[in-house]
Amino acid sequence: MAAIEGDLDVQALANLFNDLGINRNPRHREVIALRMTGGWWGPATRYNLVSLLLQDDQGQPLPQPRWRAEGRAANPAVMFTLEAPWQDLRLAFDNIDVGEGTLRFGPLANGNYIPGDEFSLEFLPPAMQEITQMQRDELEEVLDVVGQITMQMNDLIGMQDAQIRGLEGQLRGLRGNLPVAGTPPPPPPSLDLQPAAASSPYVAPAPSAPAASAAAADLGWFAGGPGPGSLDPRLARVAYNPFLPGPSDGSGAAPAQPSAPPVASPLPSLLPAQPMQPVIQYVHPPPINPAQQVIPIQHIRAVTGNAPSNPREIPMWIGRNASAIEGVFPIPTSDIRSRVINALLGRQLGLNLDPQHCITWASAIATLYVRTHGSYPLHQLAEVLRRVSNSEGAAAAWQLGMMLTNQDYNLVWGMVRPLLPGQAVVTAMQHRLDQEVSDAARIVSFVNHLNAVYELLGLNARGQNLRVSTGGQTTARTSAGRGARGRRSQQGTPGRQSSGQAPPQGRRSSQGQQPRQSESGDQNNQRQLQGGNNRGGYNLRPRTYQPQRYGGGRGRRWNDQTARADNQQRSQSQQPQSEARGEQSRTSGAGREQGGRGNQNRNQRSAGENTDRSVNTVTATSASISASGQNGSSTTPPASGSGNQGN
């Protein structure tokens, strides 16, 4: 297997030497043991053994120094070792990693666990993220060595457990061999302590079993003193040891030792009290002081603009720009939110907010509104949202309503729904919102649904028609063009009126034959222009009405259709019988669109068609003609000599 190599940064390695207190430069072909104290594998310590290649075979410096893996285990006890985290070593040794197979364990690569060795005590088996990076053969080798180390650790634990049990047995034996004065010899050693041993005021020696009574009679408790039954218990306790040297007065009695320390029980004499260990409590590092974070107020003000000069407009201004502020500078804490708001307001008198007022954007806006208006805006929220919708759009009104009502979906939807630009938007939004599983999901997806509906209907982000600025002029020019074509066609073909056909309706009011229908058509055109310009609606229904399920009635269009039907009946009674079928087709198209717009595409028929075929064509294609009549934007001039049966 080819040795693993990589580029070497000599300067970074020299800096690493200086950081570790090594006052020399790296040498050519120097073997270094790398001790990595944590890396991508986890907190465990891993090793690798590399050699430095600084010169070529002729002794010339290499253009790019290299390092090479030695392929043997590293032993920090006898090798020159660099100890650093894996990330720091990668600065000098490009693409360095742990050793292959069991070489990553360094001194434990052969599976020999040494009790008490510092490198053995820090051993940690591979974690999951390290195992997943191993090949099959490498994994089997690593598991074999880890198994050996684990077995040795288990054996060591068993030996230490046996030693502990032996020491406990010796302790029980020593405690059982210490009799108490005035009490019979204790029973065989047991696990429970004898309470009499601690309650006796004196401690007697422990002679051998055959001579126990004789020793007690000859030695006595004090020199020439009475027996233990006549002693005053208030006297100091004395411990006597027959193995210590005493005065040779021939009596064999031990002298009194009033200054000797008292012995309460044999257990403290065998096990001295351990000093109390201090309680170590982990203290979390203090959090980052928010005051140390620099707020990019210029970037935020470039997005939001300057604060309004009128203090009453400040709360709504903050609510409209809350999302923009979060997009420029994410705000994790209330302290930073209060600092941002105070910086945007320029420390205006009476509007400075504290962190407890800025837990959320809603609380901050509510506090500002109370300070500027004197009351919480819930009672006039509908009017506030209407003004915001007129200036910023329904999406901004929705977001502001959500913040001011603490995510009350039903309340805000009831206020925003009448602000949507038309019945089609209301119906589409209601259909999309009904498909959501909960009110929380509806709140989150409301703006996305609204933008999708606006895009579908050809509206901008504020619900206005994309052609609102040029819609009125375009319609006026189109109407004027159709009227001019009607006049030119009548002047150029005088025989068309003599054939018993009526002139076009809705464009020439001077003829006097259809005054009411023409006026109705002009009024509808004016209503369309006014509705498109003022309401900013869409092309499908310029003047919508609220359906009955939302609280409305039949609406204006039902009355207009009834009036147009009466006008059509009067106009048909004044026209010749030959005009009936063509007039019905034209008036049906006018009933669906503005009154007076004729089906002009019939003028495009060829000159060779006779009257019968023209009538049949009008009858067969009445549906298509009605659809084309709704467009009302045909600019193809009428063909000369063609039958004008429907006109």
UniProtKB/Swiss-Prot annotation:
Membrane in keyword set: no
Function in brief: Involved in capsid formation and genome binding. Shortly after infection, interaction between incoming particle-associated Gag proteins and host dynein allows centrosomal targeting of the viral genome (associated to Gag), prior to nucleus translocation and integration into host genome.
Domain notes: Gag protein contains 3 glycine-arginine motifs (GR-boxes) necessary for RNA packaging, the first of which has nucleic acid binding properties in vitro.
Protein name stated in the entry: Gag polyprotein
Processing and modification events after translation: Specific enzymatic cleavages in vivo by viral protease yield mature proteins. The protease is not cleaved off from Pol. Since cleavage efficiency is not optimal for all sites, intermediary molecules are expressed.
Domain of life from the UniProt record: Viruses
GO molecular function: DNA binding; RNA binding
Chain spans, region Nucleic acid-binding: 475-500
Protein keywords: Capsid protein, Cytoplasmic inwards viral transport, DNA-binding, Host cytoplasm, Host nucleus, Host-virus interaction, Microtubular inwards viral transport, RNA-binding, Viral budding, Viral budding via the host ESCRT complexes, Viral nucleoprotein, Viral release from host cell, Virion, Virus entry into host cell
Keyword ATP-binding part of the UniProt annotation: no
GO cellular component: host cell; host cell cytoplasm; host cell nucleus; host cytoskeleton; viral nucleocapsid
